[in-house]
């Protein structure tokens, strides 16, 4: 956050944040409302939600949704972390892919026909057409997402300028703490769910407000969310589904339904299920996203009806600082998408899917807490934060 402000000299910071389920295809550790508080306490001025129909997708769709929201909010610059750290290299890579598009697409098909996943085939295709050091490594996850952000800016004819910050010390998929002060989200999650894990062990790697809110959520609700807590419900869902039922679920294709129904029979945990399910053809993340859609009963027809090829259909405002509120007031008439401060009255397929995902997310809570949280999520107004007093209003 500090590097972003320094690099962009921004007046305000806007964060587009996933809701209950993440792009990796797993439940968020804590609710979006607690994560909104974390963002506001650490310098963000506006927090808006990336709808489920974008948030649980491949990088290209994820980026398109995020950029369409930021474009509607009339931001001038975006800033993303990357393994490369040089924005010029992203522009070079985009230019080369555009010039070599026919060759690139043929290579992707060739590598997929050899049994590789789409992600691996794409990475290998890039390695064939990119020969200069002034290009990015498209096997790295943050480079991939940054590349898609920039492609989305171009495809949407946006005036947004892009900046990138190099990630140091910790890589996206690192499962252990490799540095005294910097850790990946993956390693922090793994530590929290390990037998020896505690909030004390992650304190050196997180802002104090973030650690406090994590501990507060665990104290108030008794849990931190991960896939294992949903496994019983997930397995029940699959045990009551036929291959035909499963084929209707979004991202279930190429006969994957038969493999899923076969492997669930003898799986006693989500991890053991995933270990049995994974193949060269499908990445772990891709399979987790498919599992998320099974869990939330998100069908191919749901996604088609949401019409996500264009742009986000609305902006759900989750939180704002005093500066953020002033910015919205000044620019509200220029913002073309509807801004939702609650979801009681707005009607859209994407929002129906969002509500369903929230219901599933809170399903592991005990009653009456579960019903209370679901009701609050619909009626919850944006969290307000006074950055001068550092108090929530």
From Swiss-Prot:
Q: Name any one GO molecular function.
A: ATP binding
GO CC term (a single one)? cytoplasm
Where would one find the signal peptide in this protein?
none
EC class of the enzyme, as a word: ligase
The record's similarity note reads: Belongs to the TmcAL family.
Q: Which organism is it from?
A: Bacillus cereus (strain ATCC 14579 / DSM 31 / CCUG 7414 / JCM 2152 / NBRC 15305 / NCIMB 9373 / NCTC 2599 / NRRL B-3711)
Positions contributing to ATP binding: 81, 142, 167
Q: Where in the cell is it found?
A: Cytoplasm
EC no. given is 6.3.4.-
What reaction does this catalyse? cytidine(34) in elongator tRNA(Met) + acetate + ATP = N(4)-acetylcytidine(34) in elongator tRNA(Met) + AMP + diphosphate
PANTHER family, per this entry? TRNA(MET) CYTIDINE ACETATE LIGASE (PTHR37825:SF1)
Q: Name one GO biological process term.
A: tRNA modification
Under Pfam families, the record lists: HIGH_NTase1 (PF05636)
Q: Which UniProt keywords apply?
A: ATP-binding, Cytoplasm, Ligase, Nucleotide-binding, RNA-binding, tRNA processing, tRNA-binding
Its biological purpose? Catalyzes the formation of N(4)-acetylcytidine (ac(4)C) at the wobble position of elongator tRNA(Met), using acetate and ATP as substrates. First activates an acetate ion to form acetyladenylate (Ac-AMP) and then transfers the acetyl group to tRNA to form ac(4)C34.
**InterPro entries, A to Z:** Rossmann-like_a/b/a_fold (IPR014729), tRNA(Met)_cyd_acetate_ligase (IPR008513)
Superkingdom assignment: Bacteria
Protein's name according to its UniProt entry: tRNA(Met) cytidine acetate ligase
Its organism's taxonomic lineage begins at: Bacteria, Bacillati, Bacillota, Bacilli, Bacillales
């Amino acid at each position: 956050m500090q590097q972003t402000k320094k690099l962009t000299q921004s007046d305000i910071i806007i964060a587009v944040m996933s809701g209950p389920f993440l792009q990796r295809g797993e439940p968020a550790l804590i609710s979006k409302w607690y994560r909104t508080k974390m963002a506001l306490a650490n310098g963000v001025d506006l927090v808006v939600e990336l709808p489920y129909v974008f948030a649980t997708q491949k990088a290209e769709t994820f980026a398109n949704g995020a950029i369409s929201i930021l474009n509607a909010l009339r931001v001038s610059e975006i800033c993303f972390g990357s393994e490369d750290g040089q924005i010029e290299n992203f522009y070079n890579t985009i230019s080369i892919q555009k010039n070599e598009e026919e060759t690139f697409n043929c290579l992707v098909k060739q590598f997929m026909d050899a049994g590789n996943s789409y992600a691996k085939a794409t990475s290998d295709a890039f390695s064939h057409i990119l020969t200069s050091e002034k290009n990015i490594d498209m096997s790295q996850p943050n480079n991939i997402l940054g590349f898609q952000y920039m492609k989305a800016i171009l495809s949407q004819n946006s005036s947004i300028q892009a900046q990138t910050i190099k990630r140091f010390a910790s890589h996206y998929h690192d499962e252990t703490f490799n540095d005294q002060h910097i850790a990946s989200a993956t390693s922090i999650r793994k530590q929290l769910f390990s037998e020896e894990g505690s909030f004390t062990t992650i304190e050196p790697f997180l802002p104090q407000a973030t650690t406090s809110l994590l501990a507060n959520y665990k104290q108030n609700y008794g849990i931190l969310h991960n896939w294992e807590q949903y496994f019983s419900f997930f397995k029940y869902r699959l045990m009551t589904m036929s291959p035909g039922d499963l084929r209707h679920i979004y991202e279930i294709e190429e006969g994957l339904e038969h493999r899923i129904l076969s492997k669930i029979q003898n799986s006693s945990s989500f991890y053991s299920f995933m270990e049995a399910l994974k193949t060269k053809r499908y990445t772990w993340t891709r399979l987790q996203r498919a599992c998320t859609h099974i869990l939330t009963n998100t069908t191919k027809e749901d996604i088609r009806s949401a019409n996500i090829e264009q742009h986000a259909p609305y902006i759900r405002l989750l939180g704002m600082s005093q500066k953020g509120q002033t910015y919205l007031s000044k620019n509200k008439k220029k913002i073309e998408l509807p801004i939702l401060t609650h979801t009681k009255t707005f009607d859209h397929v994407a929002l129906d899917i969002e509500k369903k995902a929230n219901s599933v997310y809170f399903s592991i809570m005990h009653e009456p807490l579960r019903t209370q949280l679901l009701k609050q999520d619909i009626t919850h107004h944006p969290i307000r934060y006074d950055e001068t007093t550092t108090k929530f209003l």
